[in-house]
Amino acid sequence: MTNYKFKLSAMRLNMFIFIIISNLVNGQAIEWISFEQAIKAQKENPKKILMDVYTDWCGPCKLMDKKTFQNPYVADYISEHYYAVKFNAEGNETINYYNNTFKNPNYDPIKKGRNATHQFTQFLGVKGYPTIVFISEGGDLITPVVGYQNPQQLELYLKMIKQGDYMVFSKPDDFEKYLKNFVPKFKN
């Protein structure tokens, strides 16, 4: 009987450890908010904004959602250091930014697939999808990063922008040196 109780206790302990480790490895999901909510939140608790500019028809956008943004290291880092915003580059959301109102006057709700480009997408200078746009604590555009980024590629930008390392780059070679010396820590 004692041997049975010991085995049962050991099984419970193993199950408990498994649950704890699973929660640590799985991390937290990114809490995506609207651009308006992020700008408002910055006033109370200044953090940079990471904006995922996507379209519904974009394959690499969907892949980035699945492979990059669901990566526990990426999700934890973004959740801790950024306000995360998803913005449909062809959607009909109204955006108020620096006393300007941006809309998508040619948006067609019936249209399947590609739609008209939102004015805010054009204002941000987005030329392809997905594009990650970084915005400072003060609401100023830092930089767009165009194209699919795997967790390690995105890690470079997340950390470089969070730490302000990009502000010392004075020529293109500076970024190349930074890239060459960067050692990613995020795992797949």
Regions found by a protein language model. Name each.
Residues 103-110, 118-133:
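Structural micro-motif
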Residues 29-32, 71-112:
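Thiol-based oxidoreductase modules, predominantly thioredoxin-like and allied folds used
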Residues 62-66:
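Detector for the c-type heme attachment site
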Residues 31-48, 78:
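A short beta-strand-turn-helix
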Residues 45-59:
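Short active-site neighborhood of thiol/selenol oxidoreductases, capturing the structured segment around
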Residues 28, 43, 125, 136, ...:
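Non-globular targeting/processing and membrane-anchoring segments
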Residues 45-49, 80-83, 127-129, 137-138:
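Loop/turn elements at helix/coil->beta-strand transitions in domains of secreted/extracellular proteins
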Residues 1-29:
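Bacterial Sec-dependent N-terminal signal peptides
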